[in-house]
Amino acid sequence: MSRFLVRLSTVVSKGATGKSVLPQKRIFAGIRLISSSTGLQSLTRYDQSTDWQRKLSPEQYVVTREKGTEVPFSGIYLNHNEVGMYHCVCCDSPLFSSEAKYDAGAGWPSFCEAHGTWEKDESHANIVRRPDNSLGSTGTEVICKHCDAHLGHVFEDGPDPTGQRFCINSVALNFKPREK
């Protein structure tokens, strides 16, 4: 393990900028390097230097980067029924299959499971769940595993067999139809 950490710090230091050569505070959290310097970047995540405000529309930016929520019943994918895959608008990771989409009547596109889920195991899915207390009650936020984009929330009031309702903002998604 120590050889791995030495090798990891060598790889990271080769990409260091002038600012990051100065002494800095580093914390190893699993394989992800977290640094107080702007010169170091995560080895497992989307490029942190991405200019999201330039890449995204204002509404996409507010929802995905500032944890906003689009107006209910306004999203382009709410009543969308085409067969295909919904991807992260920020990093293009596949998130939800149209086969898992259903009408929950909640005002946002709803899915019963994330793409890559196998018998409730989401380790191969491109989403992460996080506790969210921002609305005054405990909920579960859904974010993109690769770029930390806020996607929406998940609730335990969905249909069988999963019992889950992923309530996802349309502006956080791009749809790609299935090739024929």
Swiss-Prot record:
One of its GO terms (biological process) is actin filament polymerization. Its cofactor is Zn(2+). Residues 49-178 form the MsrB domain. One of its GO terms (molecular function) is L-methionine-(R)-S-oxide reductase activity. Its EC number is 1.8.4.12, 1.8.4.14. Residues 1-41 form a transit peptide. Zn(2+) binds at residues 88, 91, 144, 147. The active site is at 167 (nucleophile). Belongs to the MsrB Met sulfoxide reductase family. Methionine-sulfoxide reductase that specifically reduces methionine (R)-sulfoxide back to methionine. While in many cases, methionine oxidation is the result of random oxidation following oxidative stress, methionine oxidation is also a post-translational modification that takes place on specific residue. Upon oxidative stress, may play a role in the preservation of mitochondrial integrity by decreasing the intracellular reactive oxygen species build-up through its scavenging role, hence contributing to cell survival and protein maintenance. This is Methionine-R-sulfoxide reductase B2, mitochondrial. It comes from Danio rerio.
